[in-house]
Amino acid sequence: MGSAFSQRMYDSSGLQIGRVDSERYYDSSGRQIGRVDGFTIYDASGRQIGRIDGNHVHNSSGSQVGRIDGERLYSASGTQMGRIDGDRIYDGSGRQIGRAEGLRPMQIIIYFYFFM
């Protein structure tokens, strides 16, 4: 059963770049590009491409690719890659790069690390 609404991702110019519906990730044309099942991340063909471990995200080799600390997104090396402020998404230099509508921080980090 799907959710009552889709959660949407927009770029900095306001164009919709994707959406998430019931933990399935879609691109701007509506094509499914991946999904999350429990703590495992899959691409559109069903191949495991990552996993979630608490606030950490790992690639298919098990290497940490990022983590969330509050509203801040960090790379595996600890560099701040971005932050979320309300519905706005900023890169590491503070420039707004997009907007999320109804997405949790973990959904945003999954979208950016695996599907962009």
Residue ranges and their predicted role:
Residues M1-E23, D27-Q32, G38-F39, S45-Q48, ...:
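Long terminal segments
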